[in-house]
């Protein structure tokens, strides 16, 4: 499982 959460 790959989940992308940007830190912007």
UniProtKB/Swiss-Prot annotation:
Molecular functions per Gene Ontology: hormone activity
UniProt name for this protein: Hypertrehalosaemic factor
Cellular localisation: Secreted
Modified residues (Pyrrolidone carboxylic acid): 1
Role noted for this protein: Hypertrehalosaemic factors are neuropeptides that elevate the level of trehalose in the hemolymph (trehalose is the major carbohydrate in the hemolymph of insects).
Positions of modified residues (Tryptophan amide): 8
Keywords recorded for this protein, A-Z: Amidation, Hormone, Neuropeptide, Pyrrolidone carboxylic acid, Secreted
Superkingdom of the organism of origin: Eukaryota
PROSITE patterns, sorted: AKH
Cellular component, GO annotation: extracellular region
One annotated GO biological process: neuropeptide signaling pathway
Major location category of this protein: secreted
Entry annotated with the keyword Cytoplasm: no
Protein family (similarity comment): Belongs to the AKH/HRTH/RPCH family.
